[in-house]
Design a protein with these regions (language model features):
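Accessory terminal helices/loops
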Residues: 1-3, 190-191, 195, 204-270
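Metallo-beta-lactamase
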Residues: 2, 10-13, 94-141, 144-224, ...
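Conserved beta-strand hairpin/beta-sheet module of binuclear metal-dependent hydrolase folds
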Residues: 2-60, 149-161
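Active-site neighborhood of phospho(di)ester-bond hydrolases with catalytic His/Asp-centered motifs
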Residues: 42-45, 63-71, 89-93, 139-142, ...
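Short, basic, glycine/proline-bearing loop/turn elements
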Residues: 39, 132-133, 167-171
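Active-site HxH/HxHxD metal-binding segment of metal-dependent hydrolases
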Residues: 51-130, 216
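Residue-level signal for the nucleotide or nucleotide-sugar donor/cofactor binding architecture
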Residues: 76, 135, 176
């Protein structure tokens, strides 16, 4: 049986209360964040880390939950919080029909993140108002089709879910579209903000510099893939040349996570 040690920490940056909880999978610690600001909770972490998140949930002051996308490490504790506080949860309109149903995921994801109980949800509008601020809901597909980013102009902050994660991503989910991710990064880059709150990287200062690095990385990757394709190499040869490292998650997930999905998207040109 895989032993997973867990840890948590709570901190505050620029008026944003946040909790980082980690599932320490051997050789690959996996962290996820939840954010609390101006009476709203942004993403709820995974059900497997509920006990670690509870001190933060107890400290957090919120009247509503806003979800960046329908994945188990973001929706995992919505049902618990609704049972505790009877608060509404808002998510992309394409996902509201799924939230009242059991969410089935592969076994390896169940082991790390746990299963998510059904919950009630309401479709996001283009904007919403918290206690003191008006927020913009920005469509940012790529990681998932339903992915959104929450922008607070007053705070100069973007809450980006899983849009950023890291500047040089090596593996992605089979459903991801790396070219849509680039378009979404370019979209938010045009906004006026300084800070980014990422559900896996946490609080990111000088956000636009990091966003630009990821855009340039995808540009470079696209160029390399297309060059190798013109040389007659197929998708698997290209993947092996550009990503020779056998990341454990590839085998563990039976290639649900793999660099081949980025290469395929580029060859199909999005």
């Amino acid at each position: 049986m895989l032993k997973i040690e867990k840890s948590s920490e709570i901190k505050r940056e620029n008026g944003v209360l946040m909790s980082k909880c980690t599932a320490n999978v051997p050789g690959s610690p996996m962290s996820v964040y939840s954010f609390n600001v101006d009476g709203i909770l942004i993403d709820t972490g995974s059900s497997s880390l509920l006990e670690e998140f509870k001190p933060y949930f107890n400290e957090a002051d919120f009247d509503a939950i806003y979800i960046t996308h329908f994945h188990e490490d973001h929706i995992g504790n919505v049902a618990y919080l609704q049972n505790q506080r009877d608060v509404p949860a808002f998510i992309h309109s394409s996902s509201t029909s799924f939230t009242p149903k059991p969410f089935r995921i592969p076994t390896y994801r169940q082991i790390v993140w746990g299963e998510s109980a059904p919950f009630s949800s309401t479709a996001l509008d283009e904007t919403f108002t918290s206690r003191n601020h008006t927020w913009e809901v920005i469509e940012t597909p790529g990681h998932t089709k339903d992915h959104v980013t929450f922008y607070n102009r007053d705070l100069g902050a973007m809450f980006t879910g899983d849009l950023f994660v890291s500047p040089k991503v090596k593996v992605v989910l089979t459903e991801e579209n790396i070219l849509d991710t680039r378009r979404s990064l370019q979209k938010i880059e045009a906004y006026d903000f300084e800070d980014m709150y990422c559900c896996h990287a946490g609080y990111v200062k000088n956000a636009k510099e990091w966003i630009r690095l990821k855009i340039e990385y995808i540009d470079e990757l696209e160029g390399k893939v297309l060059t190798l394709s013109k040389q007659g190499k197929d998708i698997y040869e290209i993947t092996a040349e550009l990503f020779p490292k056998p990341y454990p998650i590839i085998a563990v997930s039976n290639t649900e996570w793999s660099p081949v999905h980025m290469v395929r998207t580029i060859l199909n040109r999005g």
